[in-house]
Curated annotation (Swiss-Prot):
Domain of life of the source: Bacteria
Keywords, alphabetical: Ribonucleoprotein, Ribosomal protein, RNA-binding, rRNA-binding
Biological process, per Gene Ontology: translation
Molecular-function GO term, any one: 5S rRNA binding
Protein name: Large ribosomal subunit protein uL18
NCBIfam families: L18_bact
InterPro entries found in the cross-reference section: Ribosomal_uL18_bac-type, Ribosomal_uL18_bac/euk
Protein family membership: Belongs to the universal ribosomal protein uL18 family.
Protein encoded by which gene: rplR
Function according to Swiss-Prot or TrEMBL: This is one of the proteins that bind and probably mediate the attachment of the 5S RNA into the large ribosomal subunit, where it forms part of the central protuberance.
Gene Ontology cellular-component annotations: cytosolic large ribosomal subunit
Assembly and oligomerization: Part of the 50S ribosomal subunit; part of the 5S rRNA/L5/L18/L25 subcomplex. Contacts the 5S and 23S rRNAs.
Gene3D superfamilies: 3.30.420.100
Amino acid sequence: MISKPDKNKLRVKRHKRVRGKISGTAARPRLNVFRSNANIYAQLIDDVAGVTLASASSHDAEVSGTKTEQATKVGELIATRGKAAGFEDVIFDRGGYLYHGRVQALAESARENGLKF
């Protein structure tokens, strides 16, 4: 019987490969994106200290609409919170997901609202 590869295992494998090459610092944190079936989460992470500097998700009260609209709003929120915490330059970590759909909407919204990557 032919077995179909598990999409999430392949995603985690891609994410581990990329994470070996990129790392966030206090000066330039990593913008990490996690996407589930229903929600999307974004965090600014300082990997050196191992702390989250700012975060936003579709669970936040001001986020509503379709999944793509939620991703756009989360991108706007993470950019606003990141700039308020004093971060403008970040390293984008798509988390092994394709740069398409909700991940792309979040990234473009974050760029439009002032984050540089």
